[in-house]
């Protein structure tokens, strides 16, 4: 039996399509597990605690930090997010192939935790296209869009520190998924038999 593939970290600016990409990749990968992150933000209407996120109040999240239960955590847009160690350790003990979705700083923290991890940065084709995506997605103000674009610019400056950079071209999601599948297959991830 071959060695299990490395932990893969996928990150990129807000609005670049990380969640959509991960949802589509999960359809094609047979043994993948995407850890559920802990957060202090309130659940969205359709979200389920323990499935979409692990929802904590501030006191509960503080306890996770105090007990060193998170691989990494950060405050993002006024809410805290983190990756529980138990999510990684439990999945590994079951032989799962891991893809973690986090922010740029979290990616570097995970690399410190697991130096063999592989970091993939999902980039928009341009800041202008990212702005259009954020506007189309809705639910955030013009000021919030500007804040996210400023953060995206700083994040994109760090893209060359990643093992792979994949551009999520507008109107070519299938192409993005195919590039990522090729990377994951090369790393040893298992595809479903279709």
Please name every model-derived segment.
Residues 27-35:
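Post-Walker A helix-loop "phosphate-sensing" segment adjacent to the P-loop in P-loop NTPases
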Residues 13:
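P-loop (Walker A) phosphate-binding loop of NTP-binding proteins
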Residues 16:
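ATP-binding Walker
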Residues 10:
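Hydrophobic anchor at the beta1->P-loop junction of P-loop NTPases
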Residues 39-98, 105:
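ATP-dependent small-molecule kinase phosphotransfer cores
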Residues 136-140, 154-194:
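NTP-dependent small-molecule kinase module
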Residues 19:
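Walker A/P-loop
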Residues 98-103, 112-136:
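Conserved phosphate-donor/acceptor-positioning beta-strand/loop module used by diverse small-molecule
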